[in-house]
Amino acid sequence: MIDQKVIVALDYDNQADALAFVDRIDPASCRLKVGKEMFTLFGPDFVRELHKRGFSVFLDLKFHDIPNTCSKAVRAAAELGVWMVNVHASGGERMMTASREILEPYGKDRPLLIGVTVLTSMEQSDLAGIGLDVAPQEHVIRLATLTKNSGLDGVVCSAQESSLLKNELGKEFKLVTPGIRPLGSEQGDQRRIMTPLEAVQAGSDYLVIGRPITQAVDPAAVLQAINTSLTK
């Protein structure tokens, strides 16, 4: 099976609507991302429903806590059978290392463990507001390096940082990129954006795309077009 690069970000407050959308797309064409709102509303059973339909799930809960608590949450995600789970890199090396170590018993069945660097909505002024006098890109590199040194599989980063991070941290280090907008779609609330092909060419391994697919008249066709554009 080809490694699907597209991760569709589900963003629904109604489970029936979410599953109606999911039933219109093919698990061979993408993976699915479940975030905080949906997981809080619908719980682990919703993830199990997606698994029953054949989808791989990225559980996007961005855990950030003391090492013991964070690692146990990561283990719970592994027990749920998700394909990918993430933690905030700003939680530090001990937190990330504990989270990685708790997954070791799962072997090749363990989820990918990804660090979150700087949220794509954040600009330099936002970082300054929390006491960080640093450019977003510089802080991303710092946190991504810490993530790699902690033994995690990769980071979430904007497409603009992909090329730099691939060069700095190596090809095996996975880059998961939100803020992706196919040509012709609205920018939305993500500040640092790029098209799917541009992002992959820059070094992104996985592309998180939401509304351009979930709000499309024919989401399967949009997915097919994106996947086709990536094979050129």
Curated annotation (Swiss-Prot):
User: What is any one GO biological process for this UniProt entry?
Assistant: 'de novo' pyrimidine nucleobase biosynthetic process
Q: Which UniProt keywords apply?
A: Decarboxylase, Lyase, Pyrimidine biosynthesis
Per the UniProt entry, the Enzyme Commission number(s) are: 4.1.1.23
Q: From which residue to which does the signal peptide run?
A: none
Domain of life of the native organism = Bacteria
Q: List the disulfide bonds.
A: none
What catalytic reaction does the record list? orotidine 5'-phosphate + H(+) = UMP + CO2
Q: Where does substrate bind?
A: 11, 33, 60-69, 120, 181, 190, 210-211
From the UniProt record, which GO molecular function terms apply? orotidine-5'-phosphate decarboxylase activity
The answer to keyword Lyase applying to this record is: yes
Q: Which residues form a coiled coil?
A: none
The cross-references to PROSITE patterns, in alphabetical order and at most eight, read: OMPDECASE
Its Gene Ontology cellular component terms are: cytosol
Q: In which pathway does it act?
A: Pyrimidine metabolism; UMP biosynthesis via de novo pathway; UMP from orotate: step 2/2
The keyword Lyase is assigned to this record: yes
- Provide the family line: Belongs to the OMP decarboxylase family. Type 1 subfamily.
Concerning NCBIfam families, the annotation shows: PRK00230.1, pyrF
Q: What does this protein do?
A: Catalyzes the decarboxylation of orotidine 5'-monophosphate (OMP) to uridine 5'-monophosphate (UMP).
HAMAP family (UniProt xref): OMPdecase_type1_B
Quote the PANTHER family the UniProt record gives: OROTIDINE 5'-PHOSPHATE DECARBOXYLASE
Subunit structure, as described in the record: Homodimer.
* Name of protein: Orotidine 5'-phosphate decarboxylase
The gene name on file is pyrF
